[in-house]
């Protein structure tokens, strides 16, 4: 009756009748936003990289591979990069990852190795603030030894980053 139509009238070729539903004609609509999955970009083909590639999709990560010459396409607000080059173009891969300004960058390697790379990155013109955002060694300290264990420790750290990012509590310094 709000638009001048009553029960029994015809409207757009249909006969109008009273709705017998207890809702009296109201409809509840549930909207679930669909956001792109977080992206994990892996530099390198080391055993840890391969293990991470297999494990990460099980936890909702879209996995992409990149190298110092191939820039990955970014389609998510949350992008993390893991450099697992194992001595193969470490500096070039770290440089490429840092330039893309992802949410998080981690380096699979020792603190000593990363210390030498930090000096080279600084000499290449990278700001200390950008270099300081790289987490090295990658992963949580769980005493991991095998590539699978190391990839699990990295993934646990990435899940922590993802949860904090979604809750608005992500802090690049942590």
Task: Say what each PLM segment does.
Residues 45-46, 86, 143:
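Glycine-rich Rossmann-fold phosphate-binding loop(s) that bind the pyrophosphate
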Residues 1-80, 113, 119-122, 157-174:
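Segments forming oxygen-rich coordination pockets for charged ligands
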């Amino acid at each position: 009756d709000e638009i001048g139509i009553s029960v029994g009238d015809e409207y757009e070729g249909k006969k109008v009748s009273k709705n017998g539903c207890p809702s009296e004609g109201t409809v509840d609509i549930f909207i679930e936003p669909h956001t792109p999955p977080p992206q994990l970009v892996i530099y390198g083909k080391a055993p840890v990289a391969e293990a991470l590639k297999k494990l990460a999709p099980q936890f909702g990560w879209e996995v992409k591979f990149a190298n110092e010459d191939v820039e990955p396409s970014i389609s998510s607000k949350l992008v993390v990069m893991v450099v697992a080059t194992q001595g193969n173009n470490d500096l070039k891969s770290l440089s490429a990852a840092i330039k893309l300004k992802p949410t998080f960058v981690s380096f699979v390697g020792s603190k000593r190795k990363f210390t030498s790379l930090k000096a080279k990155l600084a000499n290449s013109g990278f700001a200390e603030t950008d270099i300081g955002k790289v987490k090295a060694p990658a992963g949580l300290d769980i005493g991991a030894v095998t590539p699978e264990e190391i990839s699990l420790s990295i993934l646990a750290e990435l899940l922590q980053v993802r949860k904090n990012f979604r809750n608005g509590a992500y802090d690049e310094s942590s």
